[in-house]
Amino acid sequence: MSNRKPYVREVKRTWWKNHPFYRFYMLREATVLPLILFTLFLTFGLGCLVKGPEAWQGWLAFMANPIVVAINIVALLGSLFHAQTFFSMMPQVMPIRLKGKPVDKKIIVLTQWAAVAFISLIVLIVV
């Protein structure tokens, strides 16, 4: 064994701020934070639904709070942003071929958004 100390390069905690790719990545991954709050709000709402009408009305009043509405809007925008980045990566990760020819990337992305719109419409009709 050697007594020599190996060189360990110092890495600052904010190293990712200097690279646009990593800033974008961190922003995309940070979209989960408002979604966590949204999920907690809904879970709390389910608990209130089980407790009875008074608890349910209290939860509805809580959800009408402007801060909660703002958090929900940020969560929606974050999930749409995350979906957009995911959909734009999909043609690169899994190229699709029809009759031996590659399908245009824009068509793949637009098809995914059309599926989201269709499913959202079905959910709105059913609920």
From Swiss-Prot:
Q: Which residues form a coiled coil?
A: none
- What is any one of the record's Gene Ontology cellular component terms? fumarate reductase complex
- Membrane topology value: Multi-pass membrane protein
List locations, semicolon-separated: Cell inner membrane
- Extract the CDD domains matched here: QFR_TypeD_subunitC
Q: What parts of the sequence cross the membrane?
A: 30-50, 58-78, 107-127
Q: Which GO terms describe its molecular function?
A: succinate dehydrogenase activity
Keywords on this record?
A: Cell inner membrane, Cell membrane, Membrane, Transmembrane, Transmembrane helix
The record's annotation in InterPro entries points to:
Fumarate_red_C, SQR/QFR_C/D
Superkingdom per UniProt: Bacteria
The record describes the protein's role as:
Anchors the catalytic components of the fumarate reductase complex to the cell membrane, binds quinones.
NCBIfam families for the chain: PRK04987.1
Q: Which HAMAP family match?
A: Fumarate_red_C (MF_00708)
Q: Which family does it belong to?
A: Belongs to the FrdC family.
Q: From the Swiss-Prot or TrEMBL record, give the protein name.
A: Fumarate reductase subunit C
Gene name linked to the record: frdC
